[in-house]
């Protein structure tokens, strides 16, 4: 486990293009404050959408899904889960909300990692908040249907020691400022995934940790644009980058380059989308019709009129109904049910099916 060894990092070939990505991310970070001060209402719209998208995408990557209508109900009014999938979705949202609310209250240590895992599974009967008890493998299904072992993580017996060392190395390098946080954070997440410390939930915990650590160094775009959604949209590249960088990991002969390029690329994509969305919403605020349309576009696949009302407080309910009915006539959305319990569905959206990876969570 050498990704967070300073000598190892110093010998990693960081191409000029990657240096350009780091510089660009620094510029995005520098502009954050301007948006925070000038567009608080726009950010409120984006924040609500990001929480929902992050919860849905991070779970869906691992094949944890519920029907669209039920998902919207769970997000709007958290209730008693009906099955394991619903319980894990609610648990993830709870952990995500805590990170968004007070990221500075978390330490990057074993206790925090175990706590995040425990929160995901808090409403299930699955043992949680503890390291794996049995060795595990990361497998891949080939096109002919056969399964192959892609990577063998750290053994269950060695996991506690590895996790303690991982947290210690990260905190030491962060405190000494030996390298950019945008190198150390993805290196930490990568080693975490290679250790694979849990029997289940590794992928989701890694994404919660990613968001938490980025918040702590003031790269807060994940609060408004779902990092998890961008990962889901590029999950084949995500798995490929992990696969390439994990070659030789046990011997300390691996290259972080593929994983770093992927990680930084996703973060760049989040900032680009953030600035574009803020600009689009600001430019449409002149007309209430356009504002409602933009809000609907940024909502999940299934939504209720109350979701639009919450994000468009300056627009009357009657006006929102007019716009929704117009969008329905245009074939952009359709409705299900009547009255206040009616749900609206965006048309033409296809939900991603479960990927062909097994054991990656």
PLM regions and their residue ranges:
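FIC/Doc superfamily catalytic core
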Residues: 1-361
């Amino acid at each position: 486990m050498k990704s967070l060894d300073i000598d190892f990092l110093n010998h990693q070939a960081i191409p000029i293009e990657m240096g350009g990505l780091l510089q660009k991310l620094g510029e995005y970070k520098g502009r954050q404050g301007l948006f925070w001060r000038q567009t608080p209402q726009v950010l409120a719209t984006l924040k609500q959408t990001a929480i929902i998208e992050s919860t849905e995408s991070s779970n869906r990557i691992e094949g944890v899904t519920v029907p669209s209508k039920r998902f919207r109900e769970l997000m709007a009014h958290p209730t008693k889960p009906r099955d394991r999938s619903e319980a894990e979705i609610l648990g993830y949202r709870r952990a995500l909300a805590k990170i968004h609310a007070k990221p500075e209250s978390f330490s990057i240590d074993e206790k925090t990692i175990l706590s995040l895992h425990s929160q995901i599974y808090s409403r299930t009967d699955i043992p949680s908040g503890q390291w794996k008890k049995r060795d595990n493998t990361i497998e891949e299904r080939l096109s002919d249907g056969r399964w192959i072992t892609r990577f063998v993580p750290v053994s269950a017996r060695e996991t506690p020691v590895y996790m303690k060392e991982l947290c210690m190395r990260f905190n030491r390098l962060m405190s000494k400022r030996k390298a950019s946080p945008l190198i150390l954070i993805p290196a930490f997440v990568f080693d975490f995934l290679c250790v694979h410390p849990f029997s289940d939930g590794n992928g989701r915990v890694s994404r919660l940790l990613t968001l938490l650590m980025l918040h702590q160094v003031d790269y807060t775009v994940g609060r408004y644009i779902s990092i998890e959604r961008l990962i889901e949209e590029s999950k084949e590249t995500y798995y490929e980058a992990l696969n390439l960088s994990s070659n030789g990991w046990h011997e300390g002969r691996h290259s972080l380059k593929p994983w770093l390029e992927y990680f930084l690329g996703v973060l760049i994509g989040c900032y680009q989308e953030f600035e574009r969305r803020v600009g689009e919403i600001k430019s449409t605020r002149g007309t209430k019709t356009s504002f409602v349309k933009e809000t609907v576009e940024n909502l999940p696949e299934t939504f209720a009129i109350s979701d639009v009302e919450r994000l468009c407080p300056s627009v009357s309910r009657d006006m929102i109904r007019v716009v929704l009915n117009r969008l329905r006539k245009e074939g952009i959305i359709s409705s299900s049910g009547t009255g206040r319990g009616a749900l609206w569905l965006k048309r033409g959206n296809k939900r991603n099916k479960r990927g062909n990876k097994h054991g990656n969570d």
